C-alpha cells in the first residue's frame, strides 16, 4: 500500500504553535508521514514575531532534491514562503505529480507582514497550480483585490478551490466567486496561535490519505476544533495543540481504561453497578457517547465483572452527565460512577476538586443527571473531578468521577480506591 507522505514547506516557529512544526504534529497524529522543508526561521511567540531569516535558495533546493530523490510525495502543503521557495515548488510541480494545498500566510495574527506586493505577484502563479487555497477572510480579500487591481486574471488559466476559513468556512473557487458550500463551525472563546496551519495541514493530510475534498475539510474542521479546545496555555495566549478525537480514539481510550481498571482490586462498586463513558468532542446526544452495554458489577469472590461491550449510545444516564458538563468545560468528555462512602468524600478533598447536589432540592419534571450536574458545576464554577449526591427516594448515593478521557478517569478511580483502602 502506498505510504502516505506529505511534504510540508513553510517557516519555522520555535514555539511549535504554527509553521512546519505545527503542520508536522498535525500530519503525524493523522497517520501521515510529515516530510518538512524550512523556508525561513521566524523567531516568534504569542506576543510577537521578532524576525525572519530566509533560508538560501540553494539550501531549499537541496532539501527538495533530498526528499524527491528518496520519497514519493502525494501532497505538498505550503505555509510561509519566499520567492525562491515558490520558484522551486513550481519547478518541481512540472516534474512530479502532487497536489498543492496552499495556505497563503500573508501576515501573522500578531500583525507581522510575511508577504509584500512583489511576493504576492509570484503567489498568483502558485495559486494557479494549487488544488486548494486556504486563506482567512482578510487574506482572501487581499488576494482578490490584488488580482483585480493588477489585472492579473489573465495569469490564471486553472480554477483552484478556495476555502475561506473562519468559524464558518466558505468553499468556492478562484474564478467562480459563488459559494459552493458553507461549513458551519463552533466558536470556542479562545485566541489560539496557529489554527490556520493546523486546519490547512489537517485537510492536506486527509487528502493525502485519499479522502475527497469535502470529507477532508469536514474532518479537518474536527481536528482544528479539538486543537483549540485542548490548546496549550502560554503566558500571552494559547498555542494550537493538534488533537483528533474520533470514534476510533474514543473506543481505544475506553478499552485501555478498562484494561487499567482490571489491574486493581476495584471495590467501590455501587449496588446498581458502575458504568464508564467517553464522548466525541462536543457531543450532541447520547449517541455521541460510548459506554458499556452492560455494567461493572461485583462478583461473589470480592472482585468484579465487566459485563457487555463498548458501544456508542449504550448509556443515556452517564451520557447526560457528560452532555451537561461539556457546557462548563468542553475538554471534559468522560465520566464513571462509583460507590459513595461517607468518610471517603472528606478523605478525597485534599487531592480532588469536589462538588455535589442534593436530590431534595431537585425541581419537578427534570432529568436528575442534567439538573444535578448543572447544579454542581455552577456551584463549583466549572467541572470538578468529582460530583456526588447522598441519594434519596430509593436512589443510592453516588460518586461520579469526570475527566478529559476515560483513561484519566480510571487513573483518578485508581487513586480514589487507594485512598479508600487506607481510610
Ligand atoms: N476560537 C476558535 N474556536 C473554534 N474554532 C477556531 C477558533 N479559532 C480558529 N478556529 C478554527 O481554525 C480555523 C483557522 O482559523 P483562522 O481562520 O483564524 O485561520 P488563520 O487566521 O490563518 O489562523 P492563524 O493565522 O492563527 O494560523 C478556522 O476555520 C476555525 O475552524
Ligand atoms: C512559521 C509560521 N507559519 C505560519 C504562521 C501563521 O500564523 C506563523 N505565525 N509562523
Please annotate each region the language model reported.
Residues 2-8, 20-109, 242-243:
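Conserved N-terminal subdomain of the carbohydrate kinase-like
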Residues 24-26, 142, 189-213, 217:
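Short, small-residue alpha-helix embedded
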Residues 30-35, 180-182, 206-221:
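Phosphate-handling active-site elements
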Residues 54, 70, 215-284:
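Charged C-terminal helix
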Residues 75-150, 164-171:
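Conserved beta-alpha-beta core of the PfkB/ribokinase-like small-molecule kinase fold
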Residues 132, 139-140, 153-190, 229-234:
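Conserved phosphate-donor
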Residues 248-360:
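Extended, low-hydrophobicity segments enriched in charged/polar residues
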Residues 342-423:
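C-terminal binding/interaction regions
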Amino acid at each position: 500500500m502506498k505510504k502516505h507522505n506529505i511534504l510540508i514547506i513553510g517557516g519555522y516557529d520555535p514555539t511549535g504553535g504554527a509553521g512546519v512544526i505545527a503542520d508536522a504534529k498535525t500530519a503525524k497524529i493523522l497517520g501521515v508521514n510529515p516530510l518538512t522543508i524550512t523556508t525561513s526561521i521566524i523567531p516568534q511567540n504569542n506576543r510577537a514575531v521578532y524576525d525572519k531569516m530566509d533560508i538560501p535558495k540553494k539550501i531549499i533546493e537541496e532539501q527538495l532534491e533530498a526528499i524527491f530523490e528518496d520519497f514519493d510525495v502525494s501532497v505538498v502543503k505550503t505555509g510561509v514562503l519566499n520567492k525562491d521557495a515558490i520558484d522551486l515548488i513550481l519547478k518541481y510541480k512540472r516534474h512530479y505529480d502532487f497536489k498543492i494545498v496552499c495556505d497563503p500566510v500573508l501576515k501573522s495574527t500578531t500583525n507581522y507582514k510575511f508577504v509584500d506586493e512583489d511576493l504576492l505577484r509570484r503567489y498568483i502563479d502558485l495559486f494557479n497550480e494549487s488544488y486548494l487555497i486556504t486563506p482567512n477572510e482578510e487574506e482572501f480579500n487581499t488576494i482578490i483585490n490584488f488580482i483585480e487591481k493588477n489585472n492579473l486574471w489573465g495569469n490564471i488559466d486553472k480554477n483552484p478551490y478556495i476555502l475561506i476559513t473562519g468559524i464558518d468556512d466558505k468553499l468556492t473557487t478562484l474564478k467562480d466567486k459563488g459559494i459552493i458550500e458553507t461549513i458551519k463551525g463552533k466558536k470556542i472563546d479562545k485566541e489560539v496561535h496557529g489554527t490556520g496551519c493546523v486546519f490547512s495541514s489537517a485537510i492536506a493530510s486527509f487528502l493525502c490519505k485519499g479522502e475527497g475534498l469535502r470529507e477532508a475539510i469536514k474532518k479537518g474542521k474536527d481536528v482544528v476544533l479539538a486543537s483549540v479546545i485542548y490548546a496549550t496555555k502560554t503566558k500571552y495566549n494559547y498555542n494550537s495543540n493538534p488533537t483528533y478525537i474520533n470514534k476510533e480514539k474514543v473506543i481505544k481510550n475506553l478499552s485501555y481504561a478498562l484494561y487499567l481498571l482490571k489491574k486493581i482490586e476495584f471495590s467501590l462498586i455501587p449496588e446498581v453497578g458502575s458504568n464508564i463513558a467517553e464522548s466525541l468532542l462536543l457531543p450532541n446526544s447520547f449517541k455521541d457517547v460510548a459506554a458499556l452495554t452492560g455494567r461493572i458489577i461485583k462478583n461473589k469472590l470480592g472482585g468484579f465483572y465487566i459485563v457487555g461491550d463498548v458501544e456508542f449510545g449504550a448509556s443515556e444516564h452517564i451520557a447526560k452527565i457528560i452532555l451537561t458538563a461539556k457546557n462548563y468545560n468542553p475538554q471534559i468528555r468522560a465520566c464513571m460512577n462509583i460507590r459513595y462512602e461517607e468518610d471517603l468524600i472528606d478523605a478525597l478533598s485534599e487531592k480532588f476538586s469536589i462538588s455535589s447536589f442534593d436530590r431534595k432540592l431537585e425541581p419537578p419534571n427534570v432529568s436528575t443527571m442534567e439538573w444535578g450536574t448543572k447544579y454542581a458545576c455552577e456551584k463549583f464554577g466549572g467541572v470538578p473531578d468529582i460530583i456526588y449526591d447522598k441519594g434519596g427516594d430509593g436512589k443510592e448515593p453516588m460518586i461520579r468521577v469526570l475527566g478529559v478521557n476515560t483513561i484519566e478517569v480510571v487513573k483518578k478511580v485508581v487513586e480514589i480506591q487507594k485512598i479508600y483502602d487506607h481510610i
